[in-house]
């Protein structure tokens, strides 16, 4: 008999809670995502996360300890060697990743692009982090006139290739992206995904078409999600979860437009009758505020998210478990634009915890979540991770 019928896992993308012991190796000494945001805001107002025990993990400005937290609390240390979204999420579901995915804030190395030009017979323009729509305004006309390829990236581990459908036929663009995918399997260029970005229209009026195609990497091993799906449990992926795992182990995928849309979809799944997990990623924290180094926007987004939690609490049943965590840090006052190597919070709550919660021991890997989920549903345990299921007392 499963202890919990439904587990709701929420990943607050990039919400770190202070530098990890190995932060120095990543150039991240002193990083502290929530702590620095709380200072910037002169106190964060997150009463619902505080009730769950956020301030019991660590007190910060506006976030204090409570006498009787509703849930169990601790922080987790990442074991894998990367600090990107895919590594963090894959580890949460039981994998250990020793090859970090690369990000290219200065553009891609010349050797990689030379090889791509040679293999495709087309010149490359762009080669920088850019917004997909702005890059067309800047380089779309040149691409049409020269037949070159617009190559660009973002703050994530991606290589994107844009070309006009009437200049580079779709099939050729897809073939080019497959070549780029092969080249970026090399450790020094390892990107999480290569994306074909076809567009149409005239200079001054370009639009991206729905013919986008992603060449992602599947997780390097079976995750707890695969085990759940193969045992006929539901795995409902909300937000970019299905993309992060390239659809592996997902039984239903719900797309989201924003954090608030993500919270709406979470409430929708709370109203559904299922047995298994609902897995939500709230990406705005990272994409809109962390990379853009906007502590004010980040703080407001955290408060906006916190204000939605009562709806979640209200709908949770006695045999439900809510797990809230993060996948890495992205301190908006830290130098640069990259993620930061930090501990992440872990909060566990069920309405069946009548006595309230207490501190769990420090988790040595994010995979402890995957192990806990696996034990609850009695599926094959991941190679990595230690379950804390039995520490959660009803």
UniProtKB/Swiss-Prot annotation:
It is found in: Cytoplasm. Its main location: cytoplasm. Its EC number is 5.4.2.7. Keywords: Cytoplasm, Isomerase, Manganese, Metal-binding. Mn(2+) 1 binds at residues 13, 327-328. NCBIfam families: deoB (TIGR01696), PRK05362.1 (NF003766). Belongs to the phosphopentomutase family. Isomerase that catalyzes the conversion of deoxy-ribose 1-phosphate (dRib-1-P) and ribose 1-phosphate (Rib-1-P) to deoxy-ribose 5-phosphate (dRib-5-P) and ribose 5-phosphate (Rib-5-P), respectively. This is Phosphopentomutase. The lineage of its organism: Bacteria, Bacillati, Bacillota, Bacilli, Bacillales. The gene is deoB.
